[in-house]
Regions:
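Bacterial N-terminal signal peptides
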Residues: 8-19
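N-terminal secretory signal peptides that target proteins for export/translocation
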Residues: 1-5
């Protein structure tokens, strides 16, 4: 019994100290696509922590005290404009002077949230910039510079990996553009307006049921169904982070399929 306890205690201590023993720098990001970027740029040179857990909604999630304690021990936080970042940034600024914050939206060019090609978000900016390959290359550049500052000895390797990543993003962009070209001008019906940048890039029109991260009211649902009833829409896309109940009601009313599509998936390359 004592031997088992000793072994378990030893393993626990080893797991706790592993990042320190390995010498790896701790990097925090907000969402999985950022983690994918950092991994492609650094390999296993850093420990990557993602604030948003699988299945959680960026509109409502609150980081746990355990996550905030881990963030305090990190060297770098890469923000991207997720809704939950505000309180996190305030705490980092007030209580974590050793944590460097880098805004990965720099130079990206934000656009208003649109549900049907127009701004229905009361002036709110669309945070889903990672769904546009061109903008993702800009995000990758900012991320690479932050990592090079943190790991100066690895700067040439990071630069080389950045070039490889750019080529992979360009390849994905070209193939997606070719696949969607015959659908130019058609409507992409989504529950949450996450695909504004994506649809603009590839000549589609996003039409969303939900606005401003709020569950649609019965009146809103009825309006959407009435406006779209004369259109031939075969699919309504819903995020796994949102309840399917309201989305299913719309899909049933329009007699279209309900399909899950995750804009927060880590690997964005096709």
């Amino acid at each position: 019994m004592l031997n088992r306890l000793t072994i378990r205690l030893g393993l626990l201590i080893l797991a706790t100290l592993a990042p320190v023993i390995s010498g790896a720098q701790a990097i925090f990001v907000s969402i999985p696509p950022q983690a994918f970027l950092v991994e492609r740029l650094t390999g296993d040179l850093v420990e990557i922590e993602v604030l948003l857990p699988p299945g959680a909604s960026p509109a409502t999630y609150e980081p746990t005290p355990k996550q905030m304690a881990a963030l305090e021990r990190s060297q770098l936080y890469l923000q991207i404009g997720a809704p939950f970042e505000g309180p996190v940034l305030a705490k980092v600024a007030d209580l974590m002077p050793d944590v460097r914050i880098v805004d990965c939206r720099a130079g990206v060019g934000l656009q208003p949230i649109g549900t049907d090609g127009h701004d229905h978000g009361a002036g709110l900016l669309d945070p889903h910039i990672w769904l546009d390959p061109g903008r993702m290359k800009t995000i990758a550049n900012t991320t690479a510079k932050a990592l090079q500052a943190l790991l100066p000895d690895q700067s040439p390797a990071i630069e080389e990996r950045l070039a490889t990543l750019h080529a992979a993003i360009d390849d994905t962009d070209a193939r997606v553009g070719e696949a969607l070209a015959p659908l130019a001008g058609q409507t992409l019906l989504v529950f949450h307006p996450a695909y504004g940048y994506f649809t603009r890039r590839y000549g589609l029109v996003q039409r969303a049921v939900e606005v401003e991260g709020k569950a649609p009211s019965a009146r809103r649902l009825a309006t959407v169904v009435d406006e779209l009833d004369d259109q031939t829409l075969r699919t309504l896309f819903v995020q796994p982070q949102f309840s399917r109940t309201s989305a299913q009601r719309v899909a049933d009313a329009l007699d279209c399929d309900l399909v899950e599509l995750d804009p927060l998936a880590g690997d964005f390359l096709y």
